Amino acid sequence: MAFQLSPGVLTREQDLTNVVPAVATTIGGIVGDYNWGPANQIVSIDSENNLVAVFGKPTTANFLDFMTTSSFLAYGSNALVIREVGAAARNSVSSGTAVLIKNTEQFQESYGAGEGSVGPWAGKYAGAKGNSLKVSMADFGSYTNTSLKSFTITAAGSGYSDNAIVTLSAPDSGTATATASLTIAGGAVTAITVTFPGAGYTSAPTATITDGTGTGATATTVLTTAWPYASQFDSVPTTTTFGLGAGTTLDEMHLVVIDEDGEFTGVAGTVLEKFAGISKASDAKDDVNQSNYYKNVVNQRSKYIWSMDHLAIGTDWGNLSTAEATFNCIQQVSADHTVSLIGGVDTAPATADLQAGYLLLSNDELVDVSLVMTSGHGMAVSDYAIDNVAEIRKDCIVFVSPLRASCVNNVGAEVASVKADLSALTRSSYATMDSGWKYMYDRYNDRYVYVPLNGDIAGTCVVADVSNDPWFSPAGYNRGVIKNAVKLAWSPKKSERDTLYSAGINPVVGFPGNGIVLFGDKTLLAKPSAFNRINVRRLFIVLEKAVATAAKFQLFEFNDAFTRAQFRSLVEPFLRDVQGRRGIYDFRVVCDETNNTAEIVDQNEFRADIFVKPAKSINFITLTFVATRTGISFEELGA
């Protein structure tokens, strides 16, 4: 407490209510090839509908990772999903050579200032699906069908100087009179360019060309057609409220994103997004003081496109509102105000790409994940996940399935093939391997497909957590029933299960009347140990994670009897609770002078030894039936 130099009352407060907190144990993690969505970025997904909304529906080429993810989500948890793409994948663009923009961070670093030379727009994410997008924008010059579009010179005339002018008749409504400029060559009028399209015309305006000394020049005018998406908005874009206050005009635009080919919605021509009243001025604000600059609005809010370069006519777009009296208008003659995106390319991720995705899950301080699935990836990827995620974090389990060729249409050789797959993996208590693939219905492509079981095995751990606790075995008829499976590619017989289980592979078996069941709970640890069971490994993950989280609050306190007693009073009630919930048989916490010696204290360390007797799951049941003579006492038989 603070020293007081004169009489007074000092009020202070101490918080000694710390407890061991609950920790997450059901968060899944998977890296895969998806049809759409951000790449090389972790996205939390909590349902199959959410998975479709973010990563799109699967195709016949990339269904595997989607179906594995959806299989896991069916058990009621959420998953951290990472999409990866191959090096040749490209985002769709307006024009030029397509580029690869994996995610928001890469866009901001490489293309945030509009670089790219790909026209005004790029698809939000890599893939051919972006080729279905069309973007159209309109301002005062292109929105209505009452504006001036172009001139046709019917007579070039003669004797004109550079001072010649063209005068256009005013519109009937009096809204705004169009203006134009002349190009003179050899005294003749060679071109007439629209400088302002005007508005409110019901018929083509009359063009009067003056200052000729010879034959008079004449020209006819053509009105624009209506912007096809004008019905999506309530008003003609003119000048924003911010623009009026800043003293500029014609900064307002409307923009729509269209599903031109129906790849996103199933209906060609569907409007996916619309942005009303956005501004060409880089400093523009909306009514709630957020940026209303069209590039910022699109890049921050659109789910489908990035804004890259300005339109060709937008040479003054992006300037401050105070620097422009009137912003350039699009006009219907601008070729790039409505554009279909092209150049998007799908490329499946290579092994190195998938490994890079799993590496995002390796930092336990930034990412909380418990159940890492490897889908149908090769053993090199699965082993990488074990070595570089689970063995580094030591608070999650990697779930692996054998290769498809090992158990699908491999009659008679399944056991040897699956064991060969196992030989490529690190034998770790932080990993587990099942025996096969399931046959399930792919409703997105209307067909049945084989899918690896590792998503389901991770899902049975979720069931164990929800129905009981993480330290309960996920196997068996109570918690190990596989969902959404028509059949197994291979259901091992008893003799085959004996071989698999002895090697550390958990069989998944189809039992008539009982469904398809996970029939083993081993980890990949090769040596005899309590940690060669999933429930024991997950028990220690929970204990270590929860106690370590609570122990952080002892950092920078004094290593004295009070702190040690406080730590024991923190941990022991937690362990008694776990014991009451059948997770451990007994425990002891040692945190005193015996393990916090003077030398340990002088090294600024704090030590606690926590001894637990983990509960064991039943793997083998022996039932002995003994027949006796009628006159024999059971006590005589030792019963």
Q: Where are the language model's segments positioned?
A:
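Structured, hydrophobic secondary-structure cores that serve as assembly/anchoring elements
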Residues: 1-100, 106, 119-120, 124, ...
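Charged, amphipathic alpha-helical segments
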Residues: 6, 13, 93-105, 130-144, ...
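Surface-exposed or flexible loop/turn and strand-edge residues in extracellular/cell-surface modules
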Residues: 40, 116-118, 130, 148, ...
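A short, compositionally biased
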Residues: 114-117, 160-164, 202-204, 244-254
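Ser/Thr/Gly-rich low-complexity blocks that favor extended beta-strand/coil architectures
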Residues: 122, 126-144, 166-182, 209-219, ...
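Short, cationic low-complexity segments
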Residues: 143-144, 278-284, 629-639
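Conserved, function-critical positions that sit in or immediately flank catalytic
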Residues: 144-225
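Beta-strand-rich solenoidal segments
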Residues: 224-299
